[in-house]
A protein has these predicted regions:
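Glycine-rich hexapeptide-repeat left-handed beta-helix
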Residues: 17-171
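Phosphate-binding active sites in nucleotide-utilizing proteins
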Residues: 1-21
């Protein structure tokens, strides 16, 4: 255990490393897991064996498979993530639909085995990334991604020559 770690009602497997500033409660961590620094496991999260939950990653009601890496700066809530998944920096599961009908409405994201998620992606739940799929960096995924498919969901870049100068002069 690193310094300034807070653990409450946790089950932690053998040879797991919990680094500085990590906060975890009412969750389960497998064997040989690396948590943190500054990871946050909210209640009802499960982390599989040989998995990395890195710095500034927050899990909420998330089940994470074995040999998976969520290395930094991500929010994974109301999600099931398979084994051998790599999730890039800045990934967010968008799980709340903004409506309150008989309480908050949360939706599930499912990421099956062997998926690669590039940096700065969002999963707008409910959505499933099927086995072996590849999510391109910068994508906002709103529909299911079929197995072994590449999903690219971002607008094409448009450069407007001279426009920056015009904007600066309007100040």
């Amino acid at each position: 255990l690193g310094p300034n770690v807070f653990l409450k009602n946790m089950k932690i497997g053998a040879r797991s490393e919990i680094k500085a500033g990590t906060y975890a409660e009412d969750s389960t961590v497998g064997t040989e897991v690396k948590l943190g620094p500054y990871a946050h496991l909210r209640p009802e999260s499960e982390v599989g064996n040989h998995t990395k939950i890195g710095n500034f990653v927050e899990l909420k009601k998330a089940k994470i498979g074995e040999h998976t890496a969520i290395s930094h700066l991500s929010y994974v809530g109301d999600a099931e993530v398979g084994s051998r998944v790599n999730i890039g920096c800045g990934f967010i599961t968008c799980n709340f639909d903004g409506r309150v009908i008989n309480g908050q409405r949360k939706h599930k994201t499912t990421i099956e085995d062997d998926v690669f998620v590039g940096s700065d992606c969002q999963a707008v739940a409910p959505v499933t990334f099927k086995k072996g799929s590849f999510i391109a960096s910068g994508s906002t995924i709103t529909e299911d991604v079929e197995a072994d498919s590449l999903a690219i969901a971002r607008a094409r870049q448009v450069n407007k020559s001279g426009y920056a100068k015009k904007l600066k002069n309007e100040q």
